[in-house]
Curated annotation (Swiss-Prot):
Organism: Caenorhabditis elegans
One Gene Ontology CC term in the entry: chloride channel complex
Residue ranges of the region described as Disordered: 459-485
Protein name, UniProt field: Protein tweety homolog 1
Lineage: Eukaryota, Metazoa, Ecdysozoa, Nematoda, Chromadorea
InterPro entries: Tweety
Sugar-bearing residue positions: N142, N163, N176, N328, N341, N348, N389
Disulfide bonds: none
Gene expressing this chain: ttyh-1
Leader peptide range in chain numbering: none
Length: 519
């Protein structure tokens, strides 16, 4: 038992239940109203129900995590580092499962490519075979015309001979040859009418398989690539311990999780259907192939040999009618030579018939060669090998890997919610300043920086180093003498009815400035 056959038997154990939850015996009937299609729909609904349950679990955990009070006491570096390590390990496992999914996808694509190429080769060989059979049938029709001329000539020449017994034998042999040639011509027409659309059926199967496989392969590659990019973004956020990156990954990862589980819900019934086709697909194969089904079954089970006698039954019967004609033609020539003494008319008509029979013998050999078992056997076997061996194994590996990927994504989304309060918001990235920045000019000495760079020179230490006189805003009375106020020469005017303004501290060294207070 091969690995593929083991998988096919394993999938057969899965119950096929209709919408009434009754076991159905309908196998691989893809009609919309069939019970088998209902069974596949229930399997898809089962996968969707599991995914919905996991989604509800994630949402509940996220709500609880969002409502949880942020306690900074437990926010230690060790815990953050440990959580980042766990997320990194889960992400690596997800990457590994994605790689296995891509490998399985390529494995299925290779198997389907083998099947499609076998259909193409079978179609080409079948076209050659049918062309040889058509030429064989046309040669039989031409031979029938020449046999009719020979019969007319024999009837005319028989009136000149007196040997009635030989003439009667000639008529009998000629009738036998004519009947056999007529049967060959009629069988050729019947064969063409019966198998005339076989090429179209093969081409239709090739187009359907090519379209399905190309779309399936491209769809999975795009989705898995997007999932890989999202996971890579999450890994970067985990390594940088970025709160914003973790939140963004949670949002995008939620949709990726939904997509992965939708793929699981769709892929599982398709895998079961493929296994059922390989195990019990004769009914649908017979329906789609029609008259070609028996021929395909023959080439699938025949043993290829170097001889040309291993042919399908319709072709073998068609060619076997020619076996007795050469011997009958030789006997006919001997009798006509004796009866008609090598008459020119008889010789010419007999030569034309002989040429036609020789041509038919050559075409019969061509039909046997182009329709023999060794011509089609490998292509038919490769079709079953690519579909029921490589594709089944690839789909099984893909199902296992994407199921594990869905589980790991579920765990990842649960764990990543714990980082919302543990990871800190990273500062903005460093921005390079240009040459016009007044706070950090490039290539300029600090002495050229304006004093009022801060908007005011208050509390600016550079003000003290300037040569301008101080305004006493930063150093108080640094430039004034340290004499007490009562020791200074101050005059007080007498009290009068009219107050006159007198310069205050007129003898002060700073009286040449505009800051004066008059009383």
């Amino acid at each position: 038992m091969t690995f593929a056959s083991f998988l096919i038997n394993f999938y057969s154990v899965i119950p096929r239940l209709n919408f009434k939850f009754h076991w159905t015996n309908d196998v691989f009937n893809l009609e919309w109203s069939s019970e088998y299609f209902q069974a596949l729909a229930l399997v898809a609904c089962l996968g969707a129900a599991v995914s919905l349950l996991l989604l509800v679990t994630i949402i509940i955990v996220w709500i609880c995590q969002a409502c949880h009070k942020n306690e900074t006491t437990g926010k230690t570096r060790r815990r953050v580092r440990r959580l980042s390590t766990v997320l990194f390990i889960i992400s690596v496992l997800c990457f590994f499962m994605l790689g296995v999914c891509l490998f399985a996808n390529e494995h299925v694509n290779r198997g389907m490519s083998i099947s499609i190429n076998s259909i193409i080769n079978t179609k080409k060989s079948y076209q050659i075979s049918t062309a040889q059979i058509s030429q064989f049938q046309e040669a039989a029709l031409n031979t029938t015309v020449h046999l009719k001329n020979l019969e007319d000539t024999v009837h005319v020449e028989s009136k000149k001979t007196k040997n009635a017994t030989i003439v009667q034998q000639i008529d009998q042999i000629l009738t036998n040859i004519t009947d056999e040639i007529d049967i060959i011509a009629k069988n050729g027409k019947l064969f063409q009418a019966k198998h005339g659309d076989d090429i179209g059926k093969l081409e239709k199967i090739r187009k359907v398989l090519s379209l399905y496989e190309s779309e399936r392969w491209a769809f999975l590659v795009i989705l898995l690539s997007i999932t890989m990019v999202v996971l890579f973004t999450g890994v970067v956020a985990f390594c940088k311990q970025s709160k914003k990156g973790a939140v963004v990954f949670s949002a995008i990862g939620f949709f990726i999780f939904v997509v992965v589980w939708l793929l699981i819900s769709i892929s599982l019934p398709l895998t079961i259907a493929l296994a059922d086709f390989c195990r019990d697909g004769d009914q649908v194969t017979r329906k789609n192939l029609g008259n070609l089904y028996e021929t395909v079954q023959f080439y699938n089970t025949c043993v290829p040999v170097t001889t040309h006698d291993n042919l399908p039954l319709p072709v073998a019967r068609h060619v076997a009618l020619l076996n007795n004609i050469p011997a009958n033609k030789s006997q006919l020539d001997r009798l006509m030579e004796v009866a008609f003494n090598s008459s020119a008319a008889i010789v010419n008509s007999s030569s034309a018939v002989g040429d036609d029979i020789t041509k038919m013998l050559k075409l019969a050999g061509a039909v046997s060669s182009s329709s023999s078992c060794y011509v089609f056997h490998d292509d038919v076997v490769n079709f079953y090998y690519g579909t029921c061996n490589q594709s089944v194994a690839g789909m099984s590996i893909y199902m296992l890997s994407i199921l594990l990927l869905g589980v790991f994504l579920f765990i990842l989304l649960i764990v990543v919610s714990k980082t919302w309060n543990l990871f800190s918001r990273l500062p903005n990235e460093y921005t390079e300043v240009d040459e016009d920045d007044p706070f950090f000019p490039r290539g300029v000495n600090d002495s050229t920086i304006p004093v009022d760079i801060y908007g005011t020179h208050v509390y600016n230490p550079r003000t003290r180093d300037r040569t301008e006189p101080s305004t006493n805003t930063t150093s108080g009375t640094a430039d004034e003498p340290n004499a007490p106020l009562w020791s200074q020469n101050v005059t007080v005017p007498l009290v009068s009815n009219s107050m006159s303004r007198q310069p205050f501290m007129s003898d002060h060294p700073y009286n040449n400035y505009e800051d004066r207070y008059n009383m």
